[in-house]
Regions:
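N-terminal amphipathic/basic-hydrophobic helices that include classical n-h-c signal peptides
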Residues: 1-17
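Nuclease catalytic cores that cleave nucleic-acid phosphodiester bonds
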Residues: 18-168
Length: 168
């Protein structure tokens, strides 16, 4: 695993044209695999940021950064290093809120893009579910990542990458 440092952004003359970051600890493997498949086809860099060591796909376009453990260490790293024009894949709503406020595009592994227009609603729903879980009125976690989610994610990823590459 690579120690924390900012990956270099190369000029678009044959180098990396864009970067997709993944909050790797919570991202389903199917979503990570889909991003890597797109990266191989469209020639962009994928940076997995994790709080614990993981198996990194063995492609040159993929980097793994393991941050020191601690609450929100991976989130803080993503907010510090991702820049507008890049995409972050995350299911963490407070993290997405921080990224969107910075102008970074964020997408959840089920294919729903976070935006300034939907952030307050998504934060409210997240807080409600957290409260219900803490009161024992609801089980923990989202449902399993199914085929419908995989397709919605692939479609949203394609749409967002196309948009970001046009803006680059």
């Amino acid at each position: 695993a690579v120690r924390p440092q900012s990956p270099g952004r190369e000029a678009s003359s044959g180098g990396i044209s864009m970067r997709v970051w993944i909050d790797a600890d919570a991202c389903p493997r199917a979503a990570k695999d889909q991003v890597v498949k797109f990266a191989l086809k469209r020639q962009f860099e994928v940076v997995l940021v994790a709080g614990q060591s993981q198996i990194k796909p063995s492609f040159a376009c993929v980097k793994l950064i393991v941050v020191p453990s601690g609450p929100d260490a991976a989130d803080d790293y993503l907010v510090e290093h991702a820049v507008p024009g890049e995409l972050v894949i995350c299911s963490d709503v407070p993290l997405a809120d921080r990224l969107v406020k910075k102008g970074v595009t964020a997408l959840d592994p089920r294919g729903k893009e976070f935006s300034p227009a939907n952030m307050s609603e998504r934060l409210a729903v997240r807080n409600l579910f957290t409260d219900l879980r803490e009161q024992g009125q609801m089980g923990g976690g989202p449902p399993p990542h199914g085929e419908k989610d995989k397709q919605a994610f692939a479609n949203a990823l394609d749409r967002i990458l196309t948009r970001l590459m046009r803006q680059a």
